[in-house]
């Protein structure tokens, strides 16, 4: 890690903001209402700049631009699939050119450590866009041997105008994961970026213009969920909506889609993912990975390993070592290369997490370390570990989205399966064991869209991610991620004579 850190270029800790308006038709606009909102540096609580506050009227303008770009005969609809791939590769090249700037801007607006922004987030952004660039001319239909004198085949056609609503925890990465499959398959996009972290997505919007995407293909509207987000979800001329965020808002989006034009919906929502430490696990590795599973990204991961189930005969040792690791975690200025943990994204999240810590103490969980603010200013929270957590406690059931680890004890594999699955969520799960039979059994028994064995938070552009139950609908990334962005059309032609 130290060697990798040395390879990271020094950041500008005060990166200039070039774009803070609404991006429609490859042009920058103020909000129709002229309203703005502040975006804040979570390390200091200070305002970085004002950003145009998009609302229903701005979404309407963006949808009109997108619909015009999607008309039959338009440059985008007439473009060869291979050229769509070329544009995505060009976009990735431009992001790579500006990688140092974008990583610094992400850290300024989001608070995540700059080294992570540069090495993890930006790396995955590039891989994701290039992966989908490769799919552009390879995701196609089939010819079908239908009975009779007919020729039948399928076409994979773009869905059309895609509303995409992205969260604040991985702004650049979530933007790439949604733009990649949508643009590779020929769709047009109206994207609503999180009000907490709009700056990097707006910069990338300008790069889509520089890359050569035609006007109206990519439109980006900063704004709030109840206004701009709701306008997208309920819009009669949006063909599909994709949302990443809380399960609570996911409900609202699915309802709005149903009440309007029954647009297609994909949702990647919350989680309370179980991380199961079997007694035969490699203890050094399990402790470090369980720490990473929960504390990575300030605990602000939908798939965080937020219920750490530890088999009883290694429970005491695991707890002791996990507390020591949490106490050694370096919290501080995210631009410092030694920092492991920056601030929570904003004051709302900061207070929410502290509220969950209070609840854990009140309900009888054992606070083993942390438990409070970690600085006099900014939204920093101490790495916190609770032991003796019971399944019925609020901190064991609800998504905290912060640096708060819950450790629970279990006896048997059968018992832990039932407890792990006793959740409204089903996003991810993990198992640490050297026993292949236990790993295999648990990978099948756990109700989760992703199961990691002897690892955690391993993502690839090639592997799909999504949830069971109330963790969402559909999958993102991988070949599976293309399905939500295409309509399958069957074409059948009468022929004089069919031969094999």
UniProtKB/Swiss-Prot annotation:
Keywords: Acetylation, Mitochondrion, NAD, Oxidoreductase, Ubl conjugation. Coiled coil: none annotated. GO terms for cellular component: mitochondrial matrix; mitochondrion. NAD(+) binds at residues 245-250. GO terms for biological process: aldehyde catabolic process; ethanol catabolic process; nitroglycerin metabolic process; regulation of dopamine biosynthetic process; regulation of serotonin biosynthetic process. The active site is at 268 (proton acceptor), 302 (nucleophile). GO terms for molecular function: aldehyde dehydrogenase (NAD+) activity; carboxylesterase activity; NAD binding; phenylacetaldehyde dehydrogenase (NAD+) activity. It is found in: Mitochondrion matrix. It comes from the Eukaryota. It holds the Pfam family Aldedh. Pathway: Alcohol metabolism; ethanol degradation; acetate from ethanol: step 2/2. Disulfide bonds: none annotated. It is an enzyme of class 1 (oxidoreductase). The record marks 169 as: Transition state stabilizer. Transmembrane segments: none annotated. In response to mitochondrial stress, the precursor protein is ubiquitinated by the SIFI complex in the cytoplasm before mitochondrial import, leading to its degradation. Within the SIFI complex, UBR4 initiates ubiquitin chain that are further elongated or branched by KCMF1. Its EC number is 1.2.1.3. The modification N6-acetyllysine is found at residues 35, 56, 142, 358, 366, 409, 411, 424, 434. It catalyses: an aldehyde + NAD(+) + H2O = a carboxylate + NADH + 2 H(+). Required for clearance of cellular formaldehyde, a cytotoxic and carcinogenic metabolite that induces DNA damage. Belongs to the aldehyde dehydrogenase family. Homotetramer. This is Aldehyde dehydrogenase, mitochondrial. It comes from Equus caballus. The gene is ALDH2.
């Amino acid at each position: 890690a130290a060697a990798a850190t040395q390879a990271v270029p020094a950041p500008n800790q005060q990166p200039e903001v070039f774009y803070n308006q609404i991006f429609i038709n490859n042009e920058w606009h103020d909000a129709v209402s002229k309203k703005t909102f502040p975006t804040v540096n979570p390390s200091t609580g200070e305002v970085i700049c004002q950003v145009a506050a998009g609302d229903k009227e701005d979404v309407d303008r963006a949808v009109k631009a997108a619909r015009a770009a999607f008309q039959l005969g338009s440059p985008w609809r007439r473009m060869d699939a291979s050229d769509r791939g070329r544009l995505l590769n060009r976009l990735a090249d431009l992001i790579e050119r500006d990688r140092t700037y974008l990583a610094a801007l992400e850290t300024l607006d989001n608070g995540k450590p700059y080294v992570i922004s540069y090495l993890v987030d930006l790396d995955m952004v590039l891989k994701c866009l290039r992966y989908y660039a490769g799919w552009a001319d390879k995701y196609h239909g089939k010819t079908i041997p239908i009975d009779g004198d007919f020729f039948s085949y399928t076409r994979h056609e773009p869905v059309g105008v895609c509303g995409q609503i992205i969260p604040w925890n991985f702004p650049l990465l979530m933007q790439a994961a949604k733009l990649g499959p949508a643009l590779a398959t020929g769709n047009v996009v109206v994207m609503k970026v999180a009000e907490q972290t709009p700056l990097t997505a707006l910069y990338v919007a300008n790069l889509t213009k520089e890359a050569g995407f035609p006007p109206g293909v990519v439109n980006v509207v900063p704004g709030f969920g109840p206004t701009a987000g709701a306008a997208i979800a309920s819009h009669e001329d949006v063909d599909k909506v994709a949302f990443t965020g809380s399960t609570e808002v996911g409900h609202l989006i699915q309802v709005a889609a149903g009440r309007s034009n029954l647009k297609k919906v994909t949702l990647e929502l919350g989680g309370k993912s179980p991380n199961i430490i079997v007694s035969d696990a490699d203890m050094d590795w399990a402790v470090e990975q369980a720490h990473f599973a929960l504390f990575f990204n300030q605990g602000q991961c939908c798939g965080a390993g937020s219920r750490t189930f530890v088999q009883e005969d290694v429970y005491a040792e695991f707890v002791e070592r996990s507390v020591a690791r949490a106490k050694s975690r370096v919290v501080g200025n995210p631009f410092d290369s030694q920092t492991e943990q920056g601030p929570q994204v904003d004051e709302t999240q900061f207070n929410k997490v502290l509220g969950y810590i209070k609840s854990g103490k009140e309900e009888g969980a054992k606070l083993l370390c942390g438990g409070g603010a970690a600085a006099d200013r900014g939204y920093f929270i101490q790495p916190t570990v609770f032991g003796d957590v019971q399944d019925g406690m609020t901190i064991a059931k609800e998504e905290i989205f912060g640096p708060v680890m819950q450790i629970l004890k279990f006896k048997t594999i059968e018992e832990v399966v039932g407890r792990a699955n006793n959740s409204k969520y089903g996003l991810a799960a993990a198992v640490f064991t050297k026993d292949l039979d236990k790993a295999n059994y648990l990978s099948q028994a756990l109700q989760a869209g992703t199961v990691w064995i002897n690892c955690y938070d391993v993502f690839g552009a090639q592997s799909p991610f999504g949830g069971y139950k109330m963790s969402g609908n559909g999958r993102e990334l991988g070949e599976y991620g293309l399905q939500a962005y295409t309509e399958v059309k069957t074409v059948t032609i009468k022929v004089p004579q069919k031969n094999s």
